Structures are given as C-alpha cells and as structure tokens.
Regions:
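A short, gly/pro- and small-residue-rich
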Residues: 118-145
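Short internal beta-strands
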Residues: 46-54
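Short, glycine-rich nucleotide/cofactor-binding loops
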Residues: 9-10, 14-31
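Short glycine-rich anion-binding loops that position phosphate/pyrophosphate groups of nucleotides
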Residues: 16-18, 116-119
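Conserved acidic residues
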Residues: 8, 108-110
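Histidine-anchored nucleotide/phosphate-binding helix
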Residues: 25-44
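A glycine-rich helix N-cap at a beta->alpha junction
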Residues: 63-98
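Positively charged, low-complexity intrinsically disordered leader regions
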Residues: 1-9
C-alpha cells in the first residue's frame, strides 16, 4: 500500500534551539533524518527538512549518513533519486507567513513536526523550564495556521 504518490513532498519541521549555548538540539534532528530516510525507502517520498538556519549544516552532514543526497532547491529534489531537501525557515515572525505560503504552494502530501517549537497564545516560545526562547526559534509554527 502506498501513501500519496512517488516524489510527493513531505515536510519535516525540526530544530529546537537550546539555551545556554544557542545551538540546535540533536535528538529531534537525528529522528527527523531517520524519518526522512524511511519515507524515501518506503514510499518514494521527497522529504524536506524545515528548520532554523542554525540547523542546516547538521542536516546537510547527516544526509550522507542516512544515504540521501540533499539540496536546497526543491525542484532538484523532486527530480533526483534518493534525495531530500532542506529549507532554512526564518526566525522573523513578520517574514514567516510569506515563507510558509511559498512552502504550502508546493502542496506537500504531509507535514510532520519533530521537536519544533511553537508559540503560545501570546506569541511566545518557551523551553522546558519556561524560559522565553522566542528569538532563537524558527517561526515555522505558522505552517499550522
């Protein structure tokens, strides 16, 4: 049984940036990469990691480890075998809706979130101990609106 069509895009949102070092956590990133590989192998999907710019280098390095080629150009991703994409999502709330609209226009078959931050009703992102980490996070939560 197949889900969607071969070469369908699947967005995987990840990349929570941690204090005090202000670097992305890695367990969500690694899990996202393994999910990306599974989607390619099982369904012929074209996974795209949507993450803060801070995470792009780690994603690019992990792609080869899971046996996938990685591109920032999503048109290329959809034409090459064993490939995936990465999109650096803005941390600026004012720019987020336009970037989200660009991604949505590509009509992904699915959107999955793995340890990505989302703002509360007041527009604030908090870490596990309640600290405000809004300025550190990609505002990819607008993809759910």
């Amino acid at each position: 049984m197949r889900c969607g069509k071969e070469n369908d895009l699947v967005y995987i949102i990840t990349g929570f940036v941690l204090l005090p070092h202000k670097v992305p956590e890695m367990d969500g990133t690694v899990s996202s990469m393994l999910l990306a590989r599974a989607l390619v192998m099982a369904f012929g999907a074209k996974p795209v990691i949507v993450c803060p710019a801070d995470s792009v280098q780690a994603i690019e390095k992990c792609a080869a480890v899971v046996g996938l080629h990685i591109y920032e150009d999503l048109d290329i991703v959809q034409t090459l075998p064993l490939s995936m994409g990465v999109v650096a999502f803005t941390k600026t709330l004012a720019d987020a809706p336009a970037q989200a609209a660009e991604l949505a226009a590509r009509k992904p078959a699915a959107v999955v979130s793995v340890e990505a931050c989302g703002a509360n009703a007041l527009g604030v992102c908090h870490n596990a101990v309640g600290l405000d980490v809004t300025a550190l996070q990609a505002r990819s939560d607008v993809l759910w609106e």
